[in-house]
Amino acid sequence: MKYTCLILLWSLFATMALPADNLIQSISIVPCPESITPGTGYFTFSGKTDFTVENEEQAEVARCFSALFTQAAGFTPCVKVGEKKGKISFLTDDALKSEAYHLEITPRQIIVKASDTKGFFYALQTIRQLLPASIEGTAVVETADWSVPAMTIKDEPRFGYRGLMVDVARFFIPKENLLRIIDCMGMLKINTLHLHLVDDNGWRIEIKRYPLLTEIGSRRVDRPGKSFPERRNPRQGEPTVEKGFYTQEDIREIVAYATRHQVEVIPEIEMPAHSNAALASYPLLACPVVDKFIGVLPGLGGNHADVIFCAGNDSVFTFLQGVIDEVVELFPSRYIHLGGDEARKTHWKECPLCQERMRQEGLEDEEALQGYFMARMSKYVQSKGKEAMGWDELTNTRIPDGAIIYGWRGYGQAAVKAAEQGHRFVMTPARIMYLIRYQGPQWFEPLTYFGNNTLKDVYRYEPIQKEWSPEVRSLLMGVQASMWTEFCNKPEDVEYQLFPRLAALAEVAWTQPWHKNWRSFLVAMDKFNEHLSAKGIVFACSMYNIQHTVTPVNGKLQVKLECERPDVEIRYTMDGKEPTDRSLLYKSPLMVTGTQTIKCTTYRAGRQMGKTLTLPLVWNKATAKPVLGNTQAGKILVNGIRGSLRQSDFEWHSWESSDSVAFTIDLQKKESLRSVSVGCITNYGMAAHKPADIEVWVSNDNRDYRKVSGKQFTDGEIFREGTFKEDVVLDLNKEIGRYVRIIAKGAGECPATHVRPGQEARIYFDEVMIE
């Protein structure tokens, strides 16, 4: 069936060449091309379609594309080298930049021009997205119309580095699933796969010289039912289970497949930290002062993550050089990533070998010792004809000569610091490009940690900042999304976190900012999601869900409902019934008094698109009353909404244990007070715990206060394991007062037996309820 919604648009624009951002809904390509000139009619693929190409490299690109038709259409367009007059012709144009392409589609033929195989490949990926989504299937679709609209496209990338980092160490991604991700990367013109192969939680690559790395390092203890931060460290002798690794033959297959899809695979071998899997396999490579059992960590590890490679032991460098020797033979990439992040120097400070190394090398502190470590390994990588890369902690001391820095902390500012010293850099800021973060309203999302990086957050990211000098701008290689996998338990979990945000990253990396358009992107992304669905790829629909904000305003509650999608309606009810497409249409914030339950969801063309959000607004004497001296707390603690089990869901107010926790609620008149309830959350793995003690003070005039109730808790009551909510209820015995002051004291540092020993616990309150 022809795309009827396109036909009118093609006829309207048939004689006009317009920038891509003006052709809203006329095509469906992610990332958005540089320019498009619509034509008239359609080119139809059939068993008579043939490719004529100039050489074998082009032929390989054409065959990769033709294979899609073999499975989905039952015919295979033939590929001919050196012949003329094919339906689809490849022509080399040396005037085009690398990866750029010109694509001319008419009803009779398709002409593809590029200067390299990458450009030819990307031109065909553009055609692939224009085809029906059933092109991705494995069964022949007899009724499909394999037509694409006539047009001329001129396209080239904004950045040369368009990357995705996938962490296969914390959760091992089977080879077959990784290949599916690579295929999707090719469709999106993402050209770099940064493969995080090793960490505290697993060693995932076979090194023949050191077989224990996979015999021991790929295994770990199971902690069923526990999220990553909650998992306790392994005990010596505790049984382990195989979590997986790639053989060297697997790696060769992955690299070859990626090469066919124009994806460069960069291996990362972490050092000196994130090395428990390696040190569990070869414990003599740790500092001799380490007196604890070294095992592959199932979770964060607490102070066991302090165990890192010994910088004073030459055997460590011999070992790592041996690993690098095999890695360079497996990966043809120009680059090897050496990690370098989050190295705690606890044992280095106590280690006689490390201290002796510092004296020998004239190093002033342990940070400089890491600089020595990374510089030494960087030079070895360079001796193998490769370039070294590392995380932005390399800027904490002298950066290794020639090292490429990945900016990840915060908004990646440290990488700019490296650029000011002449180093190339890649931006992958955690606050925007870490796909482990929630991609939509958290009440609907699988548990992870930290805050939100929504589809729109990723899409609107602009890596080049106005204040950057021309020199800094010239050193930016590109951008990368980073997929950390500690909360993933199956390959589908990884896919869910990746898609569709990876499509947004693709447009950031490929498309010039002036061609980007949020509404146009959503239309194209919807079509791309159809391709994902046909491939059996799991993707999130979080952008259809509703984010709520409930704020006290003049004694009422203002309920604001928002959706990232501008093309949907929000329908809601206030009578407890499920919303339909005929329910009340949300147009502006709702003002609520008294207990209410609001239910709402999104609709488009009569079809429900998002999940139903239920907001039970619970009213009590504190609801919508002023909270004195703490504006932010006043927006949360008396807004009638209880928090979820995700303490970052914007319904929890938090304090460090060392903070002074004190706030006052003005009831605006004297009241008889029976009780105060304070909602708390325990998230053991994130060191979120209720306070050590809590007190209630009451006043009639906001000057003279009297203590009317209080509770204290033992360490056993505070530092309970699990993730759960509870209300701390304090009896006020019908005390009379207008002002109610809550004072709480934190529990301080988590005890030595905690999964986060020594870390300061945080207090989280969601609601104060006064009866």
Language model region names:
Residues 646-709, 724-771:
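Aromatic, loop-rich ligand-recognition surfaces of beta-strand-rich domains
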Residues 1-25:
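Bacterial Sec-dependent N-terminal signal peptides
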Residues 283, 299-300, 304-402, 409-417:
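Active-site neighborhood of glycoside hydrolase catalytic domains
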Residues 20-159, 493, 508-523, 527-531, ...:
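Contiguous, structured surface segment used for ligand recognition
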